[in-house]
């Protein structure tokens, strides 16, 4: 593929075998009409997504939000959902994982110019259909059915405003390790002394 460059990437239309039905319904077909759908992409900024999501969930009319992403955006999708769960306590979560079809269009690169040759053929293109993992995370203020697959109850642990207990012990361990590292670096190495004497 070194002689090709990617021109565009688009989501292929969902077939009958797709788990979630039509692409508009997503994996959560029984959502209320007022639910917010956040489509996370590889180039999305987390702070922009969370600013909109937090403002939307602050409204009393909004009861649920769905973060969805596919391919390389799945890690960013999980990050957004976890940060929002920390900011807003008491959110119920359902996670769905599936595969989506993505069509990539590649165009051949023109060969290097040779003296006396004119380009006669237009660039050839190649279409590739890939199955990529897709993740959808539903966060709801209302209680969800705990028997459905992928359900997580609200987190009852303390939020970010309370003082951490485990982190302090890790910090103290890290400080002692950092102190040992600086003490070791301050001692001159025997080879370095020999080089200084010969120079």
UniProtKB/Swiss-Prot annotation:
Its main location: nucleus. One of its GO terms (cellular component) is ribonuclease MRP complex. It is found in: Nucleus, Nucleolus. Gene3D superfamilies: Alba-like domain. Residues 1-31, 146-199 are annotated as: Disordered. GO terms for biological process: rRNA processing; tRNA 5'-leader removal. The modification Phosphoserine is found at residue 172. InterPro entries: Alba-like_dom_sf, Alba-like_NAB, DNA/RNA-bd_Alba-like. Residues 1-11 have a biased composition (Basic and acidic residues). It holds the Pfam family Alba. One of its GO terms (molecular function) is ribonuclease P RNA binding. Keywords: Nucleus, Phosphoprotein, RNA-binding, rRNA processing, tRNA processing. Residues 190-199 have a biased composition (Acidic residues). Component of ribonuclease P, a ribonucleoprotein complex that generates mature tRNA molecules by cleaving their 5'-ends. Also a component of the MRP ribonuclease complex, which cleaves pre-rRNA sequences. Component of nuclear RNase P and RNase MRP ribonucleoproteins. RNase P consists of a catalytic RNA moiety and 10 different protein chains; POP1, POP4, POP5, POP7, RPP14, RPP21, RPP25, RPP30, RPP38 and RPP40. Within the RNase P complex, POP1, POP7 and RPP25 form the 'finger' subcomplex, POP5, RPP14, RPP40 and homodimeric RPP30 form the 'palm' subcomplex, and RPP21, POP4 and RPP38 form the 'wrist' subcomplex. All subunits of the RNase P complex interact with the catalytic RNA. Several subunits of RNase P are also part of the RNase MRP complex. Belongs to the histone-like Alba family. This is Ribonuclease P protein subunit p25.
